[in-house]
Amino acid sequence: LRYKNYWKDSGGITVSGGEPLLHIDFLIDFFRRAKEYGVHTVIDTAGNPFTRDEPFFSKFNELMNYTDLLLLDIKEINNERHSYITGFSNDNILDMAKYLSEIKKPVWIRHVLVPQLSDFDEDLDKLSEFIDTLDNVERVEVLPYHTLGAFKWETLGIPYSLNGVCPPDKERISNANKKLKTSMYK
C-alpha cells in the first residue's frame, strides 16, 4: 500500500502465475483485503481450473466480488489443437469466458500466437466469432510467441517442446490482429 499514492487511479494489484485460481482461498482473502484499501484487483489466468461444480463455483463467485478485471488467456479455440498444445481441453476456459460474460465481469482476452500451433486462420476466425458472443470484453490482445524463456528449460534439463519454433513474423501478427479485431477494443 505504500505505492498507492504513486498508482493514483491507474494502478493496483495483478495476480498471475502459474495459475492463480489454484489458490482461490488465498485470492479471496488477499483481494478482500485489497478492496478494503480501495485497490484495483486483476487476475491473469488461463482459466482451466474453472468449473461450475461446488465447492469451486461458490468460491469463484465470492472472488468475483473482489475482482475488477480478468486477463483470460485463450490459447486455442480448436479443442483438439488446444489439447495438443497444453495437454488438456479448453472446455473449462471457454465456459469461464461465457460465465464472466453472464455476470458482466470485465475481461481482456489474450491469445498467444505460436506459428503452426495457434495461428491458423480458421481458428482465429472461430476465436473472433466466440469473442463476439461475449458482452464483457474490454480488450483483445495478440501476444506473439517469443523464445526468451527457452533457456530456463535447458537450464533445468527439461526438453523444450517448442524448440525450433520461431516467433511469428509481422505479417502473421498483423493478420491475427485483423482477424481478432483487436483495434476495436483499444
Question: Which residues make up each language-model segment?
Answer:
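Conserved AdoMet/S-adenosylmethionine-binding subsite of the radical SAM
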Residues: R2-G12, G17, L21-L143, L148
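A structural motif corresponding to the C-terminal lobe/cap of the Radical SAM core domain
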Residues: E129, E138, E154-K179
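Radical SAM enzyme core and accessory elements
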Residues: T182-K186
